[in-house]
From Swiss-Prot:
Species of the source: Candida albicans (strain SC5314 / ATCC MYA-2876) (Yeast)
Sequence motif: Histidine box-3, positions: 514-518
Short motif (Histidine box-2): ranges: 330-334
Gene3D superfamilies, alphabetized: Cytochrome b5-like heme/steroid binding domain
Pathway as given in its UniProt record: Lipid metabolism; sphingolipid metabolism
Keyword field: Electron transport, Heme, Iron, Lipid metabolism, Membrane, Metal-binding, Oxidoreductase, Sphingolipid metabolism, Transmembrane, Transmembrane helix, Transport
GO biological process: glucosylceramide biosynthetic process; lipid metabolic process; plasma membrane organization; sphingolipid metabolic process
InterPro entries for this protein: Cyt_B5-like_heme/steroid-bd (IPR001199), Cyt_B5-like_heme/steroid_sf (IPR036400), FA_desaturase_dom (IPR005804), Fatty_acid_desaturase (IPR012171)
SMART domains assigned to the protein according to its UniProt record, in alphabetical order: Cyt-b5 (SM01117)
Similarity field: Belongs to the fatty acid desaturase type 1 family.
Protein name, as recorded: Delta 8-(E)-sphingolipid desaturase
Length: 584
C-alpha cells in the first residue's frame, strides 16, 4: 500500500533562506520550484529565469510554455507555500538582498542587531511613514549584514551589488505613498534651489512614474489578483476559440513570398540591375525576420525542435543572424519589458536613450556591464530625434556583431535540448557569410564601389523592421512600479500596437499587434488580429489603457519621446557644468 507523503510547507522565511543560499526558487501555482540544478539547461536562457526568482511566475510560465512543457514543471517541486497566495520578493538580479533567518540585508552594515523580517515590512503602503521608508531606502541601520559567502551565492543567480531597485525592497506602491516612493522636489514649494543634476533627472522620471500609478489599477495584491484572474479568463477564451491552432498554409505562403523575393533579387543580379537586386534581397530578409520571430516563440508547429530548426534555417543560414541570440535577448525583454536596467531592447547607448535613468551609468544585468553615459553619448543623445532613422539604417550590422558574440562566446544553453543549437548556428552564420559576402558580393559583382553599394542598399532596406520593433516600445512607459505589478499590467503598460488595414498585415509581420503578442507570445502571428477584440474588451474591463496608433502617428509619438529625452539630456549636461559634486 502506497503511503502518501505529507506536503512540505515552506514559510516565507524558509524560502528567503533558500534564495540567500543562491537557489533559483520560483513560485508556480503555489508550488515551490527549485530550478537551481536545471537553470543552465533552460532553453530560454538563464537570465530570463533569474528575473523570476522569488516571484509567482505562474502567468509568465503559462504564457511562454506549451502544455507539454507545463506538465514538466512539477518535477522541480520541493513543496508548497504557506498561505493561499504568494506576495513577490524582489529577485536578486533586480537588487533584492536577503540574509539567513528571513531578513533583507545590506552589503555594508556591520550591525546585525536591528534585523527586521520581511513579513513585518511587507505591504506597507499608505500606512508607511516617511521615516520608515527612508529607513528602507537611504540607511543601512535597518539592514542585516551579508557575508562574503552569501554575496558569492547571490552572484550565481545574477546579483550585482551596483544594481539598486527604484522601488525599495518589499515596498508596495500606491496612490497614497507615491509621493514618497517617487518624490518630486519642487523648487518653489521647498524654497530651495536644485543644485544636484541627478535631482533634475529623478524629478522627471518620478513624475512619469506617478502618472503611471494614477492611470493604472491599484498595485496592491488584491487588485492585481482580480486583473490576473481576468487575464486567465481571457487566455482560456483564446484557447477555446482555437487561436493557438496554426494554419500551416499561412507559412507555406510566407516561405513562397520570401523565395519569390529572393529569386527576383537573383534575377535582377543576373541582368546587372544591382540596385533592384539589393532592394529585393533586403525585402526577403525583412520578411524572413517575421518567420524567425514566430519560430523562436514556438508559435508555428508548437514543437520545440521543429520550430527552432525552421527558425535557424531562416535566421542564421539565410539571414546571417543568430536565432539563439535573439531568443536569449527577447525572452528577457518580454519578462521585464522597458526597464532601462534590465531590458536589452531599450539599451542602445551611445545612440539612443528612452529613459533619463540611462544618463546615470546604469549597470545592464543583461550585458553584465555598465552602460557608460560617456562623451560620445552626451553628444548624440540631444540629437537622437534627428538621428533615429539614419542610425536604424545600419541596425543589421550591429546584429551581426551580437550574433557572432553569442555563438562564439557560448552565451546560450550549453546543456539540455538546446545545447546543439550553438554548432548549428555557427555553421549557419558561416554559410551565410560565404554565400552572401563571398559568392554573391565578391565573386559575382565587379568593382569595389558596386559591391559596397550592394551591401549598403540591401542592408538599409531592412531598416523598416528596426522601425517596427522600436515603435512598439520606445514611446511607452519605462517605470519600475515594484514587484506587485502583474504580468498583464506590465505588458499592456509598456507596449504599443499599430492600427493598419488587414491587407497591409504582410508588411508588419505581426509586429503591429505587439501588445497582444506580449500577452500571448506563442499565439500564431496570423491569429493576432482575431484576438484583438478580446484583448480590447479585457483592457476595458480591468482599467488598462490599450495603446494603438496609426503607423505615422506612432512614429510621431516616438520622435516626440526621443526629442523630450534629448532635451532632458541637454538640461542635465548644462546643470553638470555648475555642479562640483560626484554624480555617480
Amino acid at each position: 500500500m502506497d503511503v502518501k507523503r505529507p506536503k512540505k510547507i515552506f514559510t516565507r522565511s524558509q524560502i528567503i533562506d533558500l534564495i540567500a543560499d543562491g537557489k533559483v526558487i520560483v513560485i508556480y501555482k503555489n508550488n515551490v520550484l527549485n530550478l537551481t540544478s536545471w537553470i543552465k539547461k533552460h532553453p530560454g536562457g538563464d537570465k530570463a529565469a533569474y528575473h523570476m526568482v522569488g516571484k509567482d511566475a505562474t502567468d509568465e510560465m503559462h504564457a511562454y510554455h506549451c502544455d507539454e512543457t507545463v506538465d514538466t514543471f512539477t518535477r522541480f517541486k520541493i513543496g508548497e507555500i504557506e498561505g493561499p497566495r504568494w506576495e513577490n520578493l524582489l529577485p536578486p538580479i533586480q537588487g533584492g538582498i536577503y540574509a539567513k533567518g528571513g531578513h533583507y540585508g545590506s552589503l555594508n552594515n556591520k550591525n546585525t542587531s536591528n534585523k527586521k523580517t520581511l513579513d513585518s515590512k511587507l505591504d506597507n503602503d499608505s500606512s508607511n511613514s516617511t521615516s520608515d521608508l527612508e529607513c528602507l531606502t537611504t540607511t543601512n541601520s535597518c539592514d542585516s549584514d551579508i557575508s562574503e559567502t552569501e554575496i558569492a551565492n547571490y552572484k550565481g543567480i545574477g546579483f550585482v551589488p551596483s544594481v539598486k531597485p527604484v522601488v525599495p525592497q518589499n515596498q508596495l506602491v500606491s496612490k497614497s505613498n507615491m509621493d514618497i516612493v517617487f518624490p518630486i522636489i519642487d523648487e518653489e514649494t521647498k524654497k530651495k534651489v536644485i543644485r544636484n543634476p541627478k535631482t533634475l533627472l529623478n524629478n522627471y522620471d518620478n513624475k512619469l512614474s506617478q502618472e503611471d500609478v494614477m492611470s493604472l489599477p491599484a498595485l496592491d495584491y488584491d487588485s492585481q489578483q482580480v486583473l490576473r484572474d481576468k487575464y486567465n479568463e481571457l487566455h482560456q477564451t483564446i484557447i477555446d476559440y482555437g487561436l493557438y491552432e496554426c494554419d500551416l498554409w499561412d507559412y507555406v505562403r510566407e516561405v513562397t513570398k520570401i523565395g519569390s523575393l529572393f529569386l527576383y533579387s537573383l534575377s535582377f543580379l543576373k541582368i546587372n540591375q544591382l540596385f533592384l537586386s539589393a532592394v529585393f534581397m533586403g525585402m526577403a530578409w525583412h520578411q524572413g525576420t517575421f518567420i524567425a520571430h514566430d519560430a523562436g516563440h514556438i508559435g508555428i508547429t508548437h514543437n520545440y525542435q521543429i520550430d527552432n530548426i525552421f527558425g535557424m534555417l531562416i535566421a542564421d543560414w539565410f539571414g546571417g543572424l543568430s536565432l539563439g541570440w535573439w531568443k536569449r535577448n527577447h525572452n528577457v525583454h518580454h519578462l521585464i519589458t522597458n526597464d532601462p536596467v534590465h531590458d536589452p531592447d531599450i539599451q542602445h547607448l551611445p545612440f539612443f536613450a528612452v529613459s533619463v535613468r540611462l544618463f546615470q551609468n546604469v549597470y545592464s544585468t543583461y550585458y553584465d556591464k555598465i552602460l557608460p553615459f560617456d562623451k560620445f553619448s552626451q553628444f548624440l543623445i540631444p540629437l537622437q530625434k534627428y538621428l533615429y532613422y539614419p542610425i536604424l539604417c545600419f541596425g543589421r550590422f550591429n546584429l551581426y556583431r551580437l550574433s557572432w558574440t553569442h555563438v562564439l562566446c557560448g552565451q546560450g544553453p550549453r546543456q539540455g535540448k538546446a545545447a546543439w543549437f550553438r554548432y548549428f548556428e555557427f555553421f549557419g552564420l558561416s554559410f551565410f557569410f560565404y554565400w552572401f559576402f563571398y559568392l554573391l558580393v565578391f565573386k559575382t559583382i565587379e568593382g569595389g564601389w558596386n559591391r559596397f553599394n550592394y551591401v549598403m542598399v540591401s542592408h538599409i532596406t531592412t531598416m523598416l523592421v528596426h522601425v517596427q520593433i522600436t515603435l512598439s516600445h520606445f514611446a511607452m512607459s519605462t517605470a519600475d512600479l515594484g514587484v506587485s505589478e502583474s504580468f498583464p499590467s506590465r505588458q499592456v503598460r509598456t507596449t504599443m500596437d499599430v492600427d493598419c488595414p488587414e491587407w497591409l498585415d504582410f508588411l508588419h509581420g505581426g509586429l503591429q499587434f505587439q501588445a497582444i503578442h506580449h500577452l500571448f507570445p506563442r499565439l500564431p502571428r496570423h491569429n493576432l488580429r482575431k484576438a484583438q477584440p478580446f484583448v480590447i474588451k479585457f483592457c476595458e474591463e480591468v482599467g488598462l489603457s490599450y495603446s494603438i496608433y496609426g503607423f505615422g502617428e506612432g512614429n510621431e509619438i516616438v520622435i516626440s519621446r526621443l526629442a523630450d529625452i534629448g532635451k532632458q539630456c541637454s538640461i542635465f549636461l548644462d546643470a553638470t557644468k555648475h555642479y562640483e559634486g560626484d554624480l555617480y
